[in-house]
Amino acid sequence: MEVTDDDIKKMVSSLADRLYTYAHFLTEFCIKVTQRERYGQKDKHFFYTLLFKATNELTAVGVLFKNFYEKAALQGGMYLILRTVLSDCLAGWHVSRMRENGEDFNYMIDLIHFDHVNFSIKSLSGPYNQINRLPPQELEKQIQSIKSANPAFFHSTVDDCGKTIYRNDIFNGEFYSLKRTITYLTQQKLNDEEKGLLNHLFYYYDLFSKLEHPGMLTFMLVHKGFDPRLQERSLIDVAEALLAIEPVLYEYMLNWPELLEHSTEFHKALKNLHIEARSLIAALKMRPIEGQ
């Protein structure tokens, strides 16, 4: 049976609706978590933050996906949002697997959180200072201000006047990077399903990153939404990225199993999301696709 253009457009609209419903249930779940203050522990606070962030981002993706054909210029924004979700999923999976293995996952959470602090200090003492030429005393004052706002990340001493002076960070030069996460996850004993998941998470993160950072492929990517030959490949990319993201978000939710026990409507929404995404992928793969 031939799959027509109208069939594909209807399936895209249906998947967008399923994604919106799924994101709505995620929002309700996050509200329940905050109402009961069930994220006091460092790991729960970390996973809640990633879940709520992803919920907002997927809500936006749903709106953009709904307008896939009507507003081609929106497609680039959709890819950039998905890139962020995929990156967070990899970091979240890293921490989750460390916790499962009985490793010091709190250290990894701290290292991830420290990234903003570390970058602020390096930017202040590097590019920002090159632009603004701060006097040395003012530069040190601002660096100390950043450190004093995040004292847990730094060694400190007290001077003769009783003033706390913050010195080197506690990580001894270590820093978080996606490369670190990929190295860790590839060293784990992953089953075939997990290997496939890791492959899709990184593949689509890497693909969408080519739009985030200008390079040889950027020209093609910024025009992809306007090229009918490439649009269907884009639809597959988005659907497969969503299927890779969902299992990681569900793992975050398992931090609050009592909130999932009687969520029959949520599981129905989850099932429908999978059905629509896989149906769209299957239908598109029945058609000749440029770049497939």
Predicted regions and their residues:
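Secondary-shell segments that build the walls of catalytic and ion/ligand-binding clefts
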Residues: 1-48, 113-242, 246-292
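Long, hydrophobic/aromatic-enriched structural stretches that serve as scaffold segments
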Residues: 36-97
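Intrinsically disordered, low-complexity coil segments
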Residues: 66-73, 100-105, 188-197
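Short, glycine/acidic-rich hinge or "gate" loops at secondary-structure transitions
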Residues: 73, 97-108, 258-268
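Internal, hydrophobic cores of structured domains that mediate oligomerization or house catalytic pockets
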Residues: 77, 82-133
